[in-house]
Regions:
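Cytosolic catalytic domains that perform sulfur/thiol-centered chemistry
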Residues: 1-277
Length: 277
């Protein structure tokens, strides 16, 4: 895998097809409405050699009092799962989904958090792979296990307490990846409280994409992600990773993530909530 070109943000279907025997691929398709749908889709057909990881069961930890809907997984447990699929310190990892990168970006960010930089999201996802005339498979991969030792990047994670302190300081930029109507508090289909954290800027993650569902070119993303030192959030620490990925693809340094995001913020009714713009 040492000779494989490094992909640290995005990889196209053709590029992946050329190096598919030298990479470790993860299918992270998922549906918030039907949590078994992703696994069922994987069983019906997936990219050759792809392993399945579940957002709730593998890419998140247990939900508890005061947490958001998708807390961080135990890094040792996740590292063990990655190693079982063949990931080692030099592996090129690729993640894909069928949600325009919304869930694949979570795995991308988790690997960066674990200290592994050679990870990319398949631009266009499963649909883009098929549109390029590339095949799906049903056979389960039989990898040679790797040796993977997490090297945690604690600087990439912001807690609720730290965020509250930072927001009292001038110069802190908080970016919320949720859709505009949820941000403004006009609707809230998932969480029990509507609105946003006062002072946050709304940059819906879907605007990182073109009409075909692929990421915009880096120069266009650079105009959108001008806040290079921002803290990113969303509803539960998932789609915020999409904005972080887009920011990195634009050439910015890896920003930090408020993992608990909105669903954790509202577990304490002493924390302020805003509505409107």
């Amino acid at each position: 895998m040492v000779n494989t070109p490094e992909y640290r943000t995005l990889i196209g279907p053709g590029e992946l097809a050329e190096c598919i025997d030298q990479v470790v691929i993860f299918d992270v398709r998922f549906s918030l409405a039907d949590t078994q749908a992703g696994r069922q889709l994987y069983q019906a057909g997936h990219l050759p050699k792809a392993h399945f990881l579940d957002l709730d069961g593998d890419l998140s930890g247990p939900v508890g009092p005061g947490t958001g809907r998708h807390p961080l997984p135990d890094p040792v447990e996740l590292g063990t799962k990655l190693a079982a699929a063949g990931v080692n310190s030099e592996a090129q990892v690729v993640a894909y989904d069928d949600s325009h990168g919304a869930f694949a970006a979570r795995l991308w960010w988790l690997l960066r958090w674990l200290g592994h930089d050679r990870v990319a999201v398949l631009n266009g996802g499963c649909a883009g792979w098929q549109a390029a005339g590339l095949p799906l498979a049903t056979a389960l991969p039989q990898p040679e296990p790797g040796q993977f030792q997490p090297q945690l990047r604690h600087d990439l994670v912001v807690s609720s307490e730290a965020l509250a302190d930072l927001l009292e300081q001038s110069g802190t930029t908080l970016i919320d990846a949720r859709g505009a109507q949820r941000f403004r508090g006009e609707e809230e289909p998932i969480d029990p409280v509507a609105g946003h954290i006062p002072g946050a800027i709304n940059l819906p993650f879907a605007a990182n994409l073109d009409d075909s569902g692929k990421f915009l070119p880096a120069e266009q993303l650079r105009q959108r992600h001008e806040h290079r030192q921002a803290i990113h959030m969303c509803g539960s620490g998932v789609t915020a990773c999409h904005n972080i990925l887009a920011s990195c693809h634009a050439g910015n340094e890896l920003p930090s993530l408020y993992v608990g995001s909105w669903s954790e913020w509202i577990t304490d009714d002493r924390r302020p909530v805003a509505t409107g713009e």
